[in-house]
């Protein structure tokens, strides 16, 4: 699933082509996404100008002079900028035509994403209203996590992947951050010390910033808006490296299933706290 760096990379990639431009048409080929694409999306958007493009967690918001488009890439989606005459591929579901001859094309093979119109304040929409702070913001710090973790028996990995605690951290960056902080992913959140939270928040911020600079992590379906892969996969320390030697201690990387997800870790560098 595209995580915060992939979504931020996408936002930065589409922004120069769309911001300040007028939408001339919306072409919908398949409405059946996680939430149905509105039947009248063309009428809602045609003739409107895109005034800003922002990100909230894993959501991209296209601000128009009236209304908003809320986009989520789902499990396997991506946005790319194409010529309006470019032939669509099998899973290209929505085209947003702009008055510069280009189109924003939404591809989603597994159709877990969304492309919806919001009339009112988008931050009060049920999908956004209860999201936690951005991990790269000053609000996300060790004191905040320590307060939220009090009496939480869930694993620290599940804790930092909870979008109501902090947004945008998925399986890849959770595993990598916990490795660098030397915290076992199955450790109970309430057992994490202030010092460990200091380390963890610092590593989360550094990893996300590095991943954004590298254009995200391409493992299967993610490509940036210009069709290029992300290169942060070459910097991964534990994710996708099961049974390979740890790059620090040379012990074998192992995985454990936490909340239905395989979590990679080094048993030597990340001892479990009992």
UniProtKB/Swiss-Prot annotation:
Binds 1 zinc ion per subunit. DNA binds at residues 91, 110, 152. Signal peptide: none annotated. Its cofactor is Zn(2+). GO terms for biological process: base-excision repair. Keywords: DNA damage, DNA repair, DNA-binding, Glycosidase, Hydrolase, Lyase, Metal-binding, Multifunctional enzyme, Zinc, Zinc-finger. CDD domains: EcFpg-like_N (cd08966). It holds the Pfam family H2TH. A zinc finger (FPG-type) spans 237-271. SMART domains: Fapy_DNA_glyco, H2TH. Disulfide bonds: none annotated. It catalyses: Hydrolysis of DNA containing ring-opened 7-methylguanine residues, releasing 2,6-diamino-4-hydroxy-5-(N-methyl)formamidopyrimidine; 2'-deoxyribonucleotide-(2'-deoxyribose 5'-phosphate)-2'-deoxyribonucleotide-DNA = a 3'-end 2'-deoxyribonucleotide-(2,3-dehydro-2,3-deoxyribose 5'-phosphate)-DNA + a 5'-end 5'-phospho-2'-deoxyribonucleoside-DNA + H(+). InterPro entries: DNA_glyclase/AP_lyase_DNA-bd, Formamido-pyr_DNA_Glyclase, FPG_cat, MutM-like_N-ter, Ribosomal_uS13-like_H2TH, Znf_DNA_glyclase/AP_lyase, Znf_FPG/IleRS. The active site is at 2 (schiff-base intermediate with dna), 3 (proton donor), 58 (proton donor), 261 (proton donor). Its EC number is 3.2.2.23, 4.2.99.18. HAMAP family: Fapy_DNA_glycosyl. PANTHER family: FORMAMIDOPYRIMIDINE-DNA GLYCOSYLASE. Belongs to the FPG family. Involved in base excision repair of DNA damaged by oxidation or by mutagenic agents. Acts as a DNA glycosylase that recognizes and removes damaged bases. Has a preference for oxidized purines, such as 7,8-dihydro-8-oxoguanine (8-oxoG). Has AP (apurinic/apyrimidinic) lyase activity and introduces nicks in the DNA strand. Cleaves the DNA backbone by beta-delta elimination to generate a single-strand break at the site of the removed base with both 3'- and 5'-phosphates. NCBIfam families: fpg, PRK01103.1. Monomer. This is Formamidopyrimidine-DNA glycosylase. It comes from Legionella pneumophila subsp. pneumophila (strain Philadelphia 1 / ATCC 33152 / DSM 7513). The lineage of its organism: Bacteria, Pseudomonadati, Pseudomonadota, Gammaproteobacteria, Legionellales.
